[in-house]
Amino acid sequence: MVKAFPVGKVDMINMQPMDFEEFLIATLGQDIIEILREHYENSTPIVDAMHNELLSLYRLYLCVGGMPASVNNILSVDRDILKYNKKIVKNIISGYLSDMKKYVKDATETIRIENIYNSIPTQIGNKSNKFQYSKVRSGARSKNYETALQWLLSSKMINRICLLKSAQNPPEAFKDEEVFKLYLSDVGILNSILDINFEDIILDQEFIYKGDIAKNYVEQQLNVNFEHIYYWKNNNTAEVDFIIKNKDGLIPIEVKAGDSVKSKSLNLYIQQFKPKYGIKICSKNFGFANGIKTIPLYATFLIK
């Protein structure tokens, strides 16, 4: 049986990040949301100048994340990343660790919670396509970490998505609870833990965790609108990053950090399960072709 650990109500409220929609409103105002919604619904490209500005804001959001204190700081320095105070997010992480020790009286469980949390950033792109306890600690087994995992989920510090064994309704009946992926609740915290060079993000350079960061960002945005999120893989190498259920049924979502046109796994899923359409989230403009709806990374929050 999983033990229940109390989580401070005030701390939980304070730790919830702003999503990118809220970040956009704070930077450009409400009107931009309605403009984006029109282009999203009609799959028509937005003007290049606005597209590029929104991509720049997306990359800025990757750096600072959505924690209110972090957003307030970047806005106070007119969005100048060189003047941004990185210590704000580091202090938030320290606060998380303090909460663990405050509310979890069992020292062993505290260590397990911290070990899971610290292992997530480097497991997002795990080649095994699932979270592995052996990556948390050598010889670790799931039964020993079940309580620690539940504490992190209950505290909303992390999000979990389960493997969907078959794309059938209801999806909850076809998920594999033993095979899952974990994401951090805030992409800014992820970048802080990984100690990513902000210049690489802002200038859209290639670096080792670029794809993983984009996926964590997308999961964070989807998590606002969907109670259940899944992923899919076959017995070979094909994998679809996210599966959501909306009014159109089960919809596969592929994430690309750049503007890659390749969608091998997404196309394979579409051929096999015949969804109404698939979604590709990348740095390209809005569009629709061959059954795939292309959505810019900055418009992920519009998926509902």
Summary of predicted features, one role per range:
Residues 257-295:
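Catalytic cores of nucleic-acid endonucleases
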Residues 17-21, 165, 189-190, 285-286:
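Conserved nucleotide-binding/hydrolysis micro-motifs of P-loop NTPases
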Residues 67, 72-240, 244:
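Accessory nucleic acid-recognition modules appended to NTPase machines
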Residues 1-122:
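Interdomain motor-coupling "hinge/lid" segment immediately C-terminal to the ATP-binding subdomain
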Residues 10-12, 289-303:
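Active-site regions of enzymes building and remodeling cell-envelope glycoconjugates
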Residues 218, 222, 240-259, 278:
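Conserved catalytic cores of phosphodiester-cleaving nucleases, focusing on short active-site segments
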